[in-house]
């Protein structure tokens, strides 16, 4: 986000990623909404429950855990412990197979949390969560999604995503 394209800022002044500009000029600025649009995905009750908890509970504590200096009177250990409650529940839920789309929606946030203090994360007794995270990290899909691209400029060749490389 250090070198945001001018066109991106024109269509989405908030300047955060992701941004999807549709042919009709509509702009979609939320990851989940982009996933729903591209995959024609209507959330079921279970998916809604987990995504709501992720967005309204876990991400709140994740931000304060990772960036305590951005907030007043925040104890990052307390925030980590509050986020842990969600992860405890997710670990239990993961004893069943997590639907792929839901997994893809939750994974980036759990990855951020894990990477903030990997030694602490790995020391937790989350057998299912650790296996799920590790499986995602070594997947071909993750490798394709994390491929680095040069910043696109008007006139450049169109990049089709995801690549099949």
Give the ranges of each region predicted by the language model:
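Residues lining hydrophobic/aromatic ligand-binding pockets adjacent to catalytic sites
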Residues: 72-78, 119-124, 137
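Acidic/histidine-enriched, glycine/proline-rich intrinsically disordered or flexible terminal extensions
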Residues: 149-165
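Short, hydrophobic secondary-structure boundary micro-motifs
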Residues: 62, 122, 143-147
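Hydrophobic/aromatic-lined pockets within catalytic cores
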Residues: 39-43, 70, 95, 109-110, ...
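GST superfamily/GST-like fold recognition
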Residues: 98-125, 130
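GST-like domain detector, emphasizing the conserved glutathione-binding G-site
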Residues: 1-85, 91, 98
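C-terminal end-helix/capping segment
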Residues: 125-142
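Surface-exposed helix-capping loop/turn segments at secondary-structure junctions
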Residues: 92-99, 141-146
